[in-house]
């Protein structure tokens, strides 16, 4: 059985085998994306299926109901709202976690039958700026490259992307290519010195938001040194004269660009020279480019440089937008954005007429609907009365999170299709619908290189969980649209989607998979990965687009665009006493996914970064008077967050980084998007998640503690953060309003506890009979403790000797996990170096296995080798 990973946009293939009742998972060696490799998230997919709060039945207002009642209620409410307020009062919010078939049915129902374009997706938050940039430059949303181009290039530029963490398998492919071909150079453009930047030949830590300046400067440099391809521009590109005139501005001269970007002249010149002399260049860009007040312009600035040099449509040469989710591309194909119609068609009269004739639908939208941020504003003001959210968690993932939660709580009818009831959004729903999870649902997904792959079901549907397309189809039938939604299998939906892509397509739309429209069900079930287009001209798919220099514009030419630098307005507010002003960046951790609905309950994925932690530079820590592990409060006019603080020497001073993953399920005050203003790109509507202005202050506490228990910590405290353990959970605790004695009085009144004094504070053991149910350590500062050792006591009989011995070992302190794949800690690596004499990477890999799988920990291992081998011998 073969399927596709549920996580990032690399789209790795997975092979499953069954031994008795147990499934085994490994990478698919034949899949073109990964060739058998998997990162730690992909390798732990089977573990993720054990959802602690799996939603198995529909619920209305918290009460279990059947599907018939749920769908009848939904249809009645939708029909009433449509009759009273019209189609604009209905909205659907989708996800890049859905299959293409789910997306297609939702889009068709909304735009062709209900007559509402208020259907958008969380891909708006990650890829919509790239979509608009492609449309402006190429005439259509087209990714011209494939992953092989990274291996064939002589220069790879990674910008706005910590690829080593966010797309580990693809980064590993790049690193392996560099090992085979040392002439392949890697340049990383990123304000942070990330794990990706650590491995580059050159890292340019440019000023946040200055990307247009840097790329305009490159284009100006190419003109100055005659480093552009005159013949290619003359034959295949329009807009050169306007761009050249705009680049004549002194702002784009080398010295001024270096100053504006905060870079040394020599580093910037080195990059420009390298780019100018390297024909085989791939520029890979991701959220650091897209999630901006001018993400579209940033992407077009990159594309400008490639078009000027003719570096597109050739092996090893292309601008390459990486998607964040497994099916963000599929959503774009079907028109799952409010600014698209369907199958890469817009809202022109001829296009609307074409799609309506194909669907034979009773109505058709004639213009775009509300983009994501606008959509939830429309909910807030009551314009959208009913909202159906499928497979995403907007209460956490959208900017201005407090206002979004307020909008959701005001919504007249909030429907949420989810695999678990325990998300911040699901807890606000009136109607909860149990969705099929990865491994239970079947369909197709498209990755960043346009590869369509099958996602196959290998598990039965639990309880009354159903695929999302099934629920949408049954609603459509109840609303009287049965003829248009007679689907009984995802194969029928896919074939219709494929047929629409080729309908009246004379070659003007390069998204065309009509060659798959006639698949039998058996052929669909056996479909192997292939890149679109798939049609009469390209029956086996196509690796690269634009080889012939023809683009999807009316004149067949790509477009160069003059671009201006626009920094976001960042109004400074008076500093609070003891506060430090910081520019807040947000992004991903290596081992987590989105809002942790799928990964947050998997213990081994928590080990490398178990707690919500904001990282900042040494000067900021000093100014705040805090040390690593202390609590820091972040605030601005939108909201607050309270987190542990950590040092990151790779950050520019005055800047901070906070992961996006934490929700109210894992931390009392950890959601970063409560601090992010709803500033969006005016063209794409994509929010600016990378540049929030906050103030940071030290949070003083009366006590801090840590709880390891078989059950969750239930007592109210001022602050908490929770992580799962194989048997139970671990929770950090802190209070500034209550004394430790008051806490003990509450505990002693409610259960069987044994309290023991410690050097600084006390330890309390919760008992069930003579067995340990939980252990609480409390003191002025939280102890640094080996959680796994403490957890080993859970469920065991209380024995003073065992408790004392284990506690003394646990208090020796936790060693940071370096290699998540093989679960190798920093201390084990250091011991191998200092005690066993291992002095090189190959020796560590042979002894411990660290760094031998996805490779994202290699920079950290290199640092440890430098510190404990080379510096020790110096």
Give short role names for the model-derived ranges.
Residues 156, 199-200, 251-255, 284-289, ...:
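Flexible glycine/proline-enriched surface loops and loop-helix/loop-strand junctions
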Residues 91-99, 259-263, 286-293, 325-326, ...:
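Conserved short loop/turn motifs at secondary-structure junctions
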């Amino acid at each position: 059985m073969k399927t596709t990973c549920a996580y990032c946009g690399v789209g790795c293939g997975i092979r499953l085998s069954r031994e008795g009742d147990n499934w085994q998972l490994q990478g698919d060696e034949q899949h073109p994306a990964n060739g058998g490799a998997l990162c730690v998230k992909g390798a732990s997919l089977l573990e993720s299926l054990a959802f602690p709060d799996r939603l198995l039945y529909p619920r209305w207002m918290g009460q279990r109901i059947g599907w018939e009642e749920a769908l009848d209620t939904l249809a009645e409410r939708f029909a009433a709202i449509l009759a009273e307020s019209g189609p604009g009062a209905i909205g659907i919010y989708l996800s890049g976690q859905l299959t293409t078939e789910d997306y297609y049915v939702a889009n068709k129902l909304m735009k062709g039958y209900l007559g509402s374009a208020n259907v958008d997706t969380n891909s708006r938050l990650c890829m919509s700026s790239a979509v608009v940039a492609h449309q402006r430059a190429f005439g259509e949303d087209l990714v011209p490259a494939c992953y092989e181009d990274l291996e064939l290039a002589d220069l790879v530029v990674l910008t706005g992307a910590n690829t080593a963490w966010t797309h580990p398998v693809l980064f590993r492919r790049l690193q392996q290519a560099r090992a085979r071909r040392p002439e392949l150079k890697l340049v990383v453009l990123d304000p942070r010195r990330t794990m990706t930047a650590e491995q580059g030949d050159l890292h340019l830590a440019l000023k946040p938001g200055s990307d247009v300046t840097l790329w305009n400067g490159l284009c100006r440099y190419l003109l100055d040194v005659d480093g552009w391809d005159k013949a290619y521009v003359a034959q295949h590109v329009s807009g050169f004269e306007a761009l050249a005139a705009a680049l004549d501005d002194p702002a784009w001269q080398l010295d001024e660009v270096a100053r504006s970007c905060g870079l040394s002249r020599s580093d910037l010149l080195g990059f420009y020279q390298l780019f100018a002399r390297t024909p085989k260049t791939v520029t890979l860009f991701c959220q650091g480019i897209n999630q901006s007040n001018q993400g579209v312009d940033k992407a077009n600035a990159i594309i400008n440089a490639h078009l000027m040099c003719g570096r597109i449509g050739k092996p090893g040469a292309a601008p390459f937008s990486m998607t964040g989710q497994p099916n963000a591309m599929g959503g774009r194909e079907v028109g799952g954005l409010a600014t698209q119609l369907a199958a890469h068609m817009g809202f022109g009269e001829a296009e609307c007429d074409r799609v309506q004739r194909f669907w034979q639908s009773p109505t058709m939208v004639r213009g775009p609907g509300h983009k994501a941020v606008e959509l939830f504003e429309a909910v807030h003001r009551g314009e959208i009365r009913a909202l159906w959210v499928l497979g995403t968690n907007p209460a956490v993932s959208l900017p201005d999170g407090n206002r979004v939660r307020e909008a959701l709580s005001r919504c007249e009818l909030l429907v949420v299709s989810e695999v678990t009831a325990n998300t911040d959004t699901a807890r606000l729903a009136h109607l909860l619908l149990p969705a099929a999870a990865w491994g239970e649902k079947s369909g197709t997904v498209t990755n960043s290189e346009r590869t369509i792959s099958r996602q196959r079901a290998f598990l039965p549907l639990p309880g009354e969980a159903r695929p999302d397309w099934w629920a949408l189809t049954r609603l459509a039938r109840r609303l009287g649209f049965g003829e248009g939604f007679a689907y009984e299998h995802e194969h029928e939906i896919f074939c219709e989607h494929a047929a629409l892509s080729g309908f009246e397509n004379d070659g003007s739309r390069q998204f065309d998979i009509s060659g798959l429209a006639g698949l039998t069900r058996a052929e669909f079930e056996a479909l192997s990965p292939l890149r679109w287009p798939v049609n009469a001209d390209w029956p086996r798919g196509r690796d690269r687009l634009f080889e012939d220099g023809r683009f999807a514009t009316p004149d067949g030419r790509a477009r160069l665009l003059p671009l201006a630098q626009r920094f976001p307005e960042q109004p400074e507010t008076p500093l609070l006493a003891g506060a430090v002003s910081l520019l807040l960046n947000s992004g991903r951790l290596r081992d987590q996914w989105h809002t942790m609905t799928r990964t947050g309950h998997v213990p081994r994925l928590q080990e490398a970064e178990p707690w919500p932690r904001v990282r900042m530079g040494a000067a900021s820590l000093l100014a705040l008077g805090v040390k690593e592990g202390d609590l820091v409060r972040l605030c601005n006019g939108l909201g607050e967050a309270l987190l542990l603080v950590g040092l990151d020497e790779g950050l520019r001073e005055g800047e901070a980084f906070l992961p996006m993953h934490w929700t109210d399920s894992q931390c009392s005050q950890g959601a970063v998007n409560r601090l992010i203003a709803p500033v969006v790109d005016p063209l794409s509507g994509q929010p600016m998640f990378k540049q929030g202005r906050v103030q940071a202050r030290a949070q003083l506490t009366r006590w801090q503690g840590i709880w390891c228990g078989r059950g969750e910590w239930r007592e109210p405290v001022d602050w908490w953060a929770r992580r799962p353990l194989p048997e139970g959970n671990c929770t950090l605790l802190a209070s500034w309003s209550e004394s430790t004695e008051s806490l003990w009085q509450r505990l002693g009144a409610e259960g069987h506890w044994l309290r023991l004094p410690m050097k600084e504070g006390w330890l309390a053991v919760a008992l069930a009979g003579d067995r340990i149910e939980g252990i609480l350590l409390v003191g002025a500062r939280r102890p640094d403790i080996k959680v796994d050792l403490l957890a080993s006591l859970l469920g065991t009989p209380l024995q003073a000797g065992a408790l004392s011995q284990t506690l003394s070992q646990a208090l020796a302190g936790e060693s940071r996990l370096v290699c998540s794949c093989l679960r190798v800690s920093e201390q084990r690596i250091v011991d191998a170096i200092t005690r066993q004499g291992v002095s090189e990477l190959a020796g560590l890999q042979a002894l411990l296995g660290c760094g031998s799988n996805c490779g994202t920990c290699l920079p950290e291992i290199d640092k440890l080798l430098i510190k404990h081998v080379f510096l020790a011998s110096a």
